Amino acid sequence: MIISDTSVITNLISIEHIFLLQALYEKVIIPQAVYEELSRCHPLFLSEIQAEKSPFLEVKTVKDKNKVYELKQQAKLDNGESEAIILALELKTDLLLIDERRGRAEAQRLGIRITGLLGVLLEGKTRGFVVAVKPLMNKLIENSTFWISPLLYDKILLLAQEKEGE
């Protein structure tokens, strides 16, 4: 079972690779707060998903709203991140897709296995759904607010076996 925060989805939409979520994971669960964030920034995408006979995004409601509130306050996370982390705990998820540094740190502290957008792209390449990761990272940098440090950029190229001269 895979749960996602908003940023992985919005960034995959921005580079026109949202299909990767369904190709890699078949179904991805999002908490209500993530659905609401997506409905504000990508309403057309959500209406297209809802029109599908078997949508790959499934919305689930967090049971313990108090834990969400506590996590928001203690870790200084937004609603989507907080609900995604608590839902991951409640559903004992296999993997949480999350990019924000604080959210990732909190999820790991709570014992949740995580990956982010770059991990999704790498898995997409490994499994043959993506030809090359480098042009997708470049498109992310150009078309969104996604930031990749030069060190991480090089590390991802190395992992994707796209580093020139090596």
Residue positions per predicted region:
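Active-site-proximal, substrate-binding regions of enzyme catalytic domains
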Residues: 1-94, 101, 110-112, 151-154, ...
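Acidic, PIN/NYN-like endoribonuclease modules and their adjacent C-terminal/linker elements
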Residues: 42-44, 104-166
